[in-house]
Amino acid sequence: PKNMTHATFRDLGFAARPDGTFDVYSAGGLGNNPRFGVLVAQAVAPEKILYYIKAMWLTFRAYGNYENRGKARTRYMQEVCGGPEGYAKAYQEKLAEVLASGEDLDIHPEAPVYEKQGDGVVVAGPRVLEQKQPGLYTVSWHPLGGQPAVETLCALSDAIAGMEAVEMRLAPDETAYIINLTGAEAQK
């Protein structure tokens, strides 16, 4: 799947799969000595995600560097554990502890039901994405510097306030996605 969230270079990244599950990457990061995350799990059900988050927390508590602030990053744990394979093994051990603990960390997310229909207006542009729902669009917005003025956010809020089922979602790279827009709404 397309790595839209850059899951492979995060402390803990989840890459969505077409079947509705996630691949989990751990101990990646940018900055000095950048590293891709290690694939630690495949096809994880959405309701089981918190087990993987807790395993990451326990792994960092066990192998993270608390002495040197410059190395207090998850990507350095790959070195500490002897490389990506050693890190994957250490992570799996912590995951096994979490799963064996009996703690119920299952979540039950409900998939939203969208009844909104397109209006027949077709739009295209570098920031316009077609949604899987026919006739609906997403507009991506990446504010320069990542910090829009309050007035800009208020204007955006005013613009979408009267639009049915329109939401704004934020991505880790500071991009905002305004979703569930009809063609006419996307043009605004």
Predicted segments — roles?
Residues 1-188:
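Peripheral terminal and linker regions in Fe-S/redox and tRNA-modifying enzymes
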